[in-house]
Amino acid sequence: MQINGEIQNIKQYIVKRLEALYELTVPIGQLSTHELNAEMLEVTELLGREVAVYLNRRGKVLQVSVGDTDTVDLPEFKSRRAEGKLTGIRCIHTHPSGDTRLSEPDFSSLRRLRFDCMAAIGFRADKAGEIVGSLGFFTGDCAEDGTEQLSSVGPLPERALHTINLTYLITTINKKLSARSTKSTEDEEERALLA
């Protein structure tokens, strides 16, 4: 159970808590659990640094990373996927400041790594201990210039995040991406025949 990032100056008991994140699971179709969110945020408070986890669609933690106060390195994760579709991996990370709105680097990572979704969680500043979060995802649509569009929701209370049907969202997005990919392939074939 490897922890990615700068961990050499982290106390051993905190490293053990980070390693324990690998043992937690999330129900299929649910973004996260209170237990996972709370543990990630407690470690974030102890370190003053971002913590990120990658989960697959079955809710298994695949990777844990530690960053600094503003960012966490999100390495590529090898996964099998059809061309143009999402990776089957979602990223949940903490924002030590409590401002869980997704940043430009968050959206850039979502687009580059083609996560199912990108979530940021934190403790709400005005209500001690209340967890809030934001979620970013592909819409399955393209702008006029061909750029794949992203959307986000939040900040939302943790209980609202748990009601998002992730399976439905991902299935809908992948269907749109597949339809667009099929149309693009048909357009290319048509152009090839006309040439």
Locate the predicted segments by residue.
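Short acidic/polar alpha-helix capping motifs at helix-coil junctions
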Residues: 16, 41-44
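Short, basic/aromatic recognition patches
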Residues: 32-42
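Short, flexible loop/turn motifs enriched in small residues
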Residues: 44-50
